[in-house]
C-alpha cells in the first residue's frame, strides 16, 4: 500500500507520462535544468557501498540543490570496499577518498547504525523524501543445496572474507586452519582472493589492514594445498587475468594444473574476445609449458600449492567418521553441452572424492528482500526494475547489485549507479515525482529517536577512522580495524 500522501498518484499516470528509456550510458556533460518547485529535492539512498555513494555523487553533481541522505546499517561506511576488497589490494580502496568527498558535502549526510526494514520502513522513507534509491547490495551467499553443507568446517567465502576484513558479524567465525588441504567451490575473483589469503606468507600481510585476529590465525595455519573447483572448463572461469597472475606469482607456492584440461583450447580461443583470450593463454602456458630455470627453481622451493579443478560439480559434503566435521567433498565429473554463453555442465555419471578439512563455498552472493512493500524476485535475487525504476512503485529506485545481480567490478557499479541517478533526475524534471517540500531526515530522525535508535554521522565515522589509523601506526599497518560494535559505540559516547 502506498503512503497516504501518494494516493493521488496513479500508476497509470506514471507509466503513461514516464519519459522514454534513457540512453545506455550517461550523457557526457549531462546536466538538468529544474523548475522552482523542483529545486530542493530530498533524496534518500539506502546503502553506503559503491552503488550508494556513486548514486549520491551523480545526484549531487547534476542537481545543484538536491540533498541526499545515505542510510547504512553498519556503524561505518563504504560497504564492500571496506569489507570485501582484499587487504593486499589497497589500490582498489583508493575510491574511499572520492566517497569521503561526497559524504563531506553540505548537501549530503551519512546516517549509520540504521537498519532500513527494521528501524524504519521503506514506506516511511517514501513519505519523508521525494525519491528513495535502494543500493543495499547482496549480503547473503548462495547455498550449495547439497547434503552435509551444515557440517562444521564448511564456510561461505563471503563470511571468510568478512572475517579477515573486520566485518563485525563475522568475527566469531574462527575458521579451523589446522588441516593441510582446503577446497574452494567456485572459480571467480572472490575464490582467488580467498585462496591467495590462505596461501600468502603471513609476513606479506603484516603491513595491510587485515585484522590482527585473522593475521594471528593465518600465522598458525597448516593449510598447504588449496583446490579451486569449477563446474565448467577453462574457457568459462569467472576470475580475471590480474587475479590469476597474482596466484601464479604468489611467493612460496606453485600451481597445479592438468594439461589434459586444456587439450584443443589453442584453436578454440582464436575467436573469443581479447580479455578472455589473454586469460586462457596464460592458463595454457602455465599448464603446458615447461617453466624456465628461475621459475622452476622457485617452484621447487615452494612449500605450498594451489590448483584448479575443472569439470567438477559438488554433490555431497563428506563427514569425518564421527560425523562431527567435514572430511571431503564428493564431486560429480561433468562435461559441457551447448556453445557460448549457453554452455552448461552436465554430469557424466562418474564421481570422485576430494579430501579436505576446510570447505569454502564461493558460488555467488545474493540480495535479500528489505521490506514487504518492495517488490523482489527471489529467483533472480534482484528488485524488479526498468533502468533502475522499481516496477509499479513510483519514486522508488535501485542501483548496484540489488538492481542487476552480484556481478561486475566497482567501475561496473559506478556506471550502473549513474544510470539510475540519471533516470531519477529525468523523472524529477518531467514532474513525475511529488511536488512541494518534503521533510527528509527531520521526519526520520523523530521516528528513530522515538524507537531508541541513535544514528552515527560521518563525523562520528571520522573519529573511528582516526582511532583505527592510530592503532595501526604502532605495528606499521595503515589501520587496525575496529571490529566490536560495542567498543565503537563506546568510543563515540553512544
Swiss-Prot record:
Tell me where in or outside the cell this protein is found.
Mitochondrion inner membrane
Binding of NADP(+) occurs at 187-190, 231-232, 243, 408
Q: What is its EC number?
A: 1.18.1.6
**Per its UniProt entry, which superkingdom is the organism in?**
Eukaryota
Q: Where is the transit peptide?
A: 1-34
Q: Which residues form a coiled coil?
A: none
Record's bilayer topology term: Peripheral membrane protein
Q: How is this protein annotated for GO cellular component?
A: mitochondrial inner membrane; mitochondrion
The primary site where this protein sits is mitochondrion
Q: Which reaction does it catalyse?
A: 2 reduced [adrenodoxin] + NADP(+) + H(+) = 2 oxidized [adrenodoxin] + NADPH; 2 reduced [2Fe-2S]-[ferredoxin] + NADP(+) + H(+) = 2 oxidized [2Fe-2S]-[ferredoxin] + NADPH
Q: Which UniProt keywords apply?
A: Cholesterol metabolism, Electron transport, FAD, Flavoprotein, Lipid metabolism, Membrane, Mitochondrion, Mitochondrion inner membrane, NADP, Oxidoreductase, Phosphoprotein, Steroid metabolism, Sterol metabolism, Transit peptide, Transport
User: In what pathway does it function?
Assistant: Steroid metabolism; cholesterol metabolism
> Mind telling me which Gene3D superfamilies this protein's record contains?
FAD/NAD(P)-binding domain (3.50.50.60), NAD(P)-binding Rossmann-like Domain (3.40.50.720)
Gene Ontology MF terms in the entry: ferredoxin-NADP+ reductase activity; NADPH binding
Q: Which annotated residues bind FAD?
A: 51, 72, 80, 116, 401, 408-410
Disulfide bridge partners, by residue number: none
Its GO biological process terms? cholesterol metabolic process; ubiquinone biosynthetic process
Residues annotated with Phosphoserine modification: 313
What tissue specificity is annotated for this entry?
Answer: Expressed in the adrenal, testis and ovary and to a lesser extent in the liver and kidney.
> What is known about its subunit structure?
Monomer. Interacts directly with FDX1.
UniProt similarity note:
Belongs to the ferredoxin--NADP reductase type 1 family.
Biological role stated in the UniProt entry: Also acts as a ferredoxin--NADP(+) reductase essential for coenzyme Q biosynthesis: together with FDX2, transfers the electrons required for the hydroxylation reaction performed by COQ6.
- Please identify the protein, giving its name as recorded: NADPH:adrenodoxin oxidoreductase, mitochondrial
Amino acid at each position: 500500500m502506498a503512503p497516504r500522501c501518494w494516493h493521488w498518484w496513479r500508476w497509470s499516470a506514471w507509466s503513461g507520462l514516464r519519459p522514454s528509456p534513457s540512453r545506455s550510458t550517461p550523457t557526457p556533460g549531462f546536466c538538468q535544468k529544474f523548475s522552482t518547485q523542483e529545486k530542493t529535492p530530498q533524496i534518500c539512498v539506502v546503502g553506503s557501498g559503491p552503488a550508494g555513494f556513486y548514486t549520491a555523487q551523480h545526484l549531487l553533481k547534476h542537481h545543484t540543490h538536491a540533498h541526499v541522505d545515505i542510510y547504512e546499517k553498519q556503524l561505518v561506511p563504504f560497504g564492500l570496499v571496506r569489507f570485501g576488497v582484499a587487504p593486499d589490494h589497497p589500490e582498489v580502496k583508493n575510491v574511499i577518498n572520492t566517497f569521503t568527498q561526497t559524504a563531506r558535502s553540505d548537501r549530503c549526510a551519512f546516517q549509520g547504525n540504521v537498519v532500513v526494514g527494521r528501524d524504519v520502513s521503506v514506506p516511511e522513507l517514501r513519505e519523508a523524501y521525494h525519491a528513495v534509491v535502494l543500493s543495499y547490495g547482496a549480503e547473503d551467499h548462495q547455498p550449495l543445496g547439497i547434503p552435509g553443507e551444515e557440517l562444521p568446517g564448511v564456510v561461505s567465502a563471503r563470511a571468510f572474507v568478512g572475517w579477515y576484513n573486520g566485518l563485525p558479524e563475522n568475527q566469531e567465525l574462527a575458521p579451523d586452519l589446522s588441516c593441510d588441504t582446503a577446497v574452494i567451490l567456485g572459480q571467480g575473483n572472490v575464490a582467488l582472493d580467498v585462496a591467495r589469503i590462505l596461501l600468502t606468507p603471513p609476513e606479506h600481510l603484516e603491513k595491510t589492514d587485515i585484522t590482527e585476529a585473522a593475521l594471528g590465525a593465518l600465522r598458525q595455519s597448516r593449510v598447504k594445498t588449496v583446490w579451486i573447483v569449477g563446474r565448467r572448463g577453462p574457457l568459462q572461469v569467472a576470475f580475471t587475468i590480474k587475479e590469476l597472475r597474482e596466484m601464479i606469482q604468489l611467493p612460496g607456492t606453485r600451481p597445479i594444473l592438468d594439461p589434459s584440461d586444456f587439450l584443443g583450447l589453442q584453436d578454440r580461443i582464436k575467436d573469443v574476445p581479447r580479455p578472455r583470450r589473454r586469460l586462457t593463454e596464460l592458463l595454457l602456458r602455465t599448464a603446458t609449458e615447461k617453466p624456465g630455470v628461475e621459475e622452476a627453481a622457485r617452484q621447487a622451493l615452494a612449500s605450498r600449492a594451489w590448483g584448479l579443478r575443472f569439470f567438477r560439480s559438488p554433490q555431497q559434503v563428506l563427514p569425518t567418521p564421527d560425523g562431527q566435521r567435514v572430511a571431503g567433498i564428493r564431486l560429480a565429473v561433468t562435461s559441457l553441452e551447448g556453445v557460448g554463453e549457453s554452455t552448461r555442465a552436465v554430469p557424466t555419471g562418474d564421481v570422485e572424492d576430494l579430501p579436505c578439512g576446510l570447505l569454502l563455498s564461493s558460488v555467488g552472493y545474493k540480495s535479500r528482500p528489505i521490506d514487504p512493500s518492495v517488490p523482489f524476485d527471489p529467483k533472480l535475487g534482484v528488485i524488479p526494475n526498468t533502468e533502475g525504476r522499481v516496477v509499479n512503485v513510483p519514486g522508488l529506485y535501485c542501483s548496484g547489485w540489488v538492481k542487476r545481480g552480484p556481478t561486475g567490478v566497482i567501475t561496473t557499479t559506478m556506471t550502473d549507479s549513474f544510470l539510475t541517478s540519471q533516470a531519477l533526475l529525468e523523472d524529477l524534471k518531467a514532474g513525475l515525482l511529488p511536488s512541494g517540500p518534503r521533510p527528509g531526515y527531520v521526519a526520520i530522525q523523530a521516528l528513530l529517536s522515538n524507537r531508541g535508535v541513535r544514528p552515527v554521522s560521518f563525523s562520528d565515522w571520522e573519529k573511528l577512522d582516526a582511532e583505527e589509523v592510530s592503532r595501526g601506526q604502532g605495528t606499521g599497518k595503515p589501520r587496525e580495524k575496529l571490529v566490536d560494535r560495542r567498543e565503537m559505540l563506546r568510543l563515540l559516547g553512544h
